[in-house]
Amino acid sequence: MKKVMALIASALLLAGCSSSTGAIDLGVTEFSAKVAEAGVITLDVRTPGEFAEGHVEGARLIDFQSGNFENEIAALDKNATYAVYCRSGNRSGQAVKTMQDAGFTNVFNMNGGVIDWANAGFPLVKN
């Protein structure tokens, strides 16, 4: 019993010492609720062509593959809340990691990207 208690205590201590990245992966329903919150900045990290085909309303385009992504995020407020997405969740996951490495503290990634977003019936806008 003492060994079990010691293991539990050790696990809790280690969990408390782990670094928090600030990133949270959300499904499309949770992501929809997050982007509706006041003050949340929505970032689309797809290409300009993909963005033009349809994007989440209010999203700002910062192309992850442009070669200028790090410079563009350097101009953003690192303490703001960001909801980040792409086509499938791959690029946005990489973008979130890059943002974390740059010191961003409150970043949300949409799992499944606009593919899952559209399949779930959420709207995409063109403008």
Show the residue positions of the predicted features.
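Rhodanese-like catalytic fold shared by cysteine-dependent sulfurtransferases
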Residues: K2-I8, L12-V40, G49-T81, N90-N127
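Structural scaffold elements adjacent to functional motifs in cytosolic proteins
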Residues: T42-D44
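Short, surface-exposed ligand- or partner-binding patches at beta-edge/loop junctions that are enriched
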Residues: Y85
